């Protein structure tokens, strides 16, 4: 089942590729202690006291336009972040008795959780093949209680009179306050095992929000861990450039591209890696790795990709691509090589071809309808957040995105993830078909990260790899590569994603 929010996903991909440039270099080792929630008597008078009543009937979704059949139990409405802004939420309880409570955090930044609810892991789905809402048999509510948020403020249906939330600090504060508001509505969930799962830029939200929750004395919750799907984890060179040749080689082995030209491409990449000193970095991608920071070269990469694309495709041969894209921009080079065999290549899933229409988006049209907004209790969405194309426009708030990425964002691997792993589980999932966030770059970044007293993983992926991928799981941190998915894993292979969650994160 391929359930995508099409235009909105395309928008997410474009902006998340750009944000990678904003991440700084990191080559340091960390050993810190997590700041725990204060549960002493001195702060007990601040503790959130759950109200003993059932879920609010006013937030119950009683119907959805065009949905046929029995609607599952759903709630939506607003959670107060502070006096002048509220975040829109959708909550779906598990259909089985479950002690698991997952908060899903969409990427972008500036893309609404409502999109994920309808297109990735919620109980109701809308897709290109199914433009009317229908039951999603692979919903995460099959095993967990689920919450989706339109955050940060300025995203989706969220409403208020405040300025956009544009910093990690403010977004973290808003999230903590919104979660307090949520627990007041649904007090029985406070004792459930809480996990934050973020996709793409949502990896930054999930890790930072986890630390904010653990530093909040008024929340007495059962926090358990963080899941990161297609996560943005490193600076641009590490995430996209240095390991591009390994990514291309892996795609070729999977049989998607370059079946007859892989040896030629491999030789060309070998030359370029040496010229750019990437080979010295790749030599450190060992298991275990030596226990000192991995040095990497730095370059200024040209942004004139459209010009380079035209030049590279003129003549349509591999040699012309390598000649046209000189220097060390191996990410763009890889992208254009794929275009030679698939002129409709979509970077969030390189297995898609010209038969897929990324511009046919029934979900955004549906969410902008007045009757749908009324059914979802989203009638308070501020007109200030509404473009000429509706609240969701292309699915994401690009004005908000630009404001967020103008701030310097530190990789979550520098400090936060190592601290979290001291007491909690962190699990990464990456897709081999994702050209937006290269799994090879994430693995390189992890091998340059020290957590729980050791740098990187010790066990080699090669010793564990199957036709489906591999999983490394050491010292409270796991990394899974799936060969079946691209950037939006929950919609592409929901069964695999569930297995990843249950085997590496949920316990």
Swiss-Prot record:
Sugar-bearing residue positions: 38, 45, 259-260, 300, 448
List of catalytic residues: 200, 434, 487
First-tier enzyme category under EC: hydrolase
Compartments, record wording: Secreted
Region (Disordered): 41-64
Enzyme Commission number(s) of this protein: 3.4.16.-
Keyword Nucleotide-binding: no
Keywords recorded for this protein, A-Z: Carboxypeptidase, Glycoprotein, Hydrolase, Protease, Secreted, Signal, Zymogen
Main localization category: secreted
Name of this protein: Carboxypeptidase sxa2
Organism, as annotated: Schizosaccharomyces pombe (strain 972 / ATCC 24843) (Fission yeast)
